[in-house]
UniProtKB/Swiss-Prot annotation:
Binds 1 pyruvoyl group covalently per subunit. It is found in: Cell membrane. This is Phosphatidylserine decarboxylase proenzyme. It catalyses: a 1,2-diacyl-sn-glycero-3-phospho-L-serine + H(+) = a 1,2-diacyl-sn-glycero-3-phosphoethanolamine + CO2. Its cofactor is pyruvate. It comes from Clostridium novyi (strain NT). The record marks G255, S256 as: Cleavage (non-hydrolytic). Pathway: Phospholipid metabolism; phosphatidylethanolamine biosynthesis; phosphatidylethanolamine from CDP-diacylglycerol: step 2/2. The active site is at D113 (charge relay system), H169 (charge relay system), S256 (charge relay system), S256 (schiff-base intermediate with substrate). It is an enzyme of class 4 (lyase). Is synthesized initially as an inactive proenzyme. Formation of the active enzyme involves a self-maturation process in which the active site pyruvoyl group is generated from an internal serine residue via an autocatalytic post-translational modification. Two non-identical subunits are generated from the proenzyme in this reaction, and the pyruvate is formed at the N-terminus of the alpha chain, which is derived from the carboxyl end of the proenzyme. Keywords: Cell membrane, Decarboxylase, Lipid biosynthesis, Lipid metabolism, Lyase, Membrane, Phospholipid biosynthesis, Phospholipid metabolism, Pyruvate, Zymogen. It is a peripheral membrane protein. Its EC number is 4.1.1.65.
């Protein structure tokens, strides 16, 4: 059971997990773990399933998925009957008023819909994956010099579940460098998997880019793929000026993760998010929602 803090209602919601029984079997049984290592974490499996999700045959899954997870159709730019494949639905666009952007330059917004952990004054050699499991930023980036720039900074970890809006956005005006791609495996990023696979984020396929933001310093975006995520698509143009709320990219089918790193003394994360992280609970956030302020 995954409990997520609802910031508006100030209560804990129980997350309904897509493929819950399947995930438990894969990551908790000897047979499932063997199947995971031999097939599921491999590129060919995600590529094969990705092709199915791109096909017109997968479109029949859309309506049931929306109903099962109570996803708000009113936010979509298309009717559910207009999606040509499951991926077409998965990386759907939303109406302009579905995720309003706070234009105040001192306000830090969420880059995506998801579940958020926040870590301040980070030790880049002992970043928290889950309680008891850590990884290092230089392992994640394979770039020690860049990693050291974020000593004592802030790490924001956004977990995107399959039910979420899967486009991600810029948190400020600025210029973003070209993404650096790092090949890897395709483990799930569900908490069930995070508790079982050491250094999972360093194992999975990922991309990172440096965003030279106008108000929050040099922000490091790390986009991590997961099981069945055939592609991480960057839709921005590198080294061209963007404005707060502009789209940066999207994930194809599967759960996925976005990790933001801020330099020391650049931001203050909202108190409730920090408190819930310390208690071991994620906070549910929407793209454009206030999550902190400029220091």
């Amino acid at each position: 059971m995954i409990k997520v803090f609802n910031r508006k209602e100030k209560i804990y919601d129980i997350e309904k997990v897509a493929g819950d029984n399947y995930l438990k079997w894969i990551y908790s049984s000897p047979v499932g773990l063997n199947f995971l290592e031999l097939m599921i974490k491999k590129k060919f499996f995600s590529k094969l399933y990705g092709k199915y999700c791109d096909s017109k045959h997968s479109a029949k899954k859309v309506s049931k998925f929306i109903d099962d997870f109570n996803i708000n159709e009113k936010e979509f730019t298309l009717k559910k009957s207009d999606f040509k494949s499951f991926n077409d639905f998965f990386y759907r666009k939303l109406n302009n008023d579905a995720r309003p952007i706070i234009n105040d330059e001192n306000i830090l917004i969420s880059p995506a819909d998801g579940r958020l952990f926040a870590y301040e004054n980070i030790d880049i050699h002992n970043l928290i994956q889950v309680k008891g499991l850590t990884y290092s930023l230089d392992e994640l980036l394979k770039n020690i010099e860049l990693a050291e720039k974020y000593i004592g900074g802030t790490c924001l970890l956004f977990r995107l579940a399959p039910v979420d809006y899967h486009r991600f956005h810029f948190i400020d005006d600025g210029i973003c460098e070209e993404a650096v791609k790092i090949s890897g495996s395709y483990y799930s990023v569900n908490p069930i998997a995070l508790e079982k696979v050491p250094k999972l984020f360093c194992e999975n396929k990922r991309e990172y880019s440096i965003f030279h933001s106008k108000h929050f310093g040099d922000v490091l975006y790390v986009d991590v793929g997961a099981t069945c995520v055939g592609s991480i698509i960057q839709t921005y143009t590198p080294n061209e000026y963007v404005v707060k709320g502009d789209e940066k990219g999207y994930f194809k089918f599967g759960g996925s993760t976005i990790i933001l790193f801020f330099e020391k003394d650049k931001i203050i994360v909202d108190k409730d998010i920090v408190e819930q992280t310390q208690k071991g609970f994620e906070c549910k956030v929407l793209m454009g929602e206030k999550i902190g302020t400029k220091l």
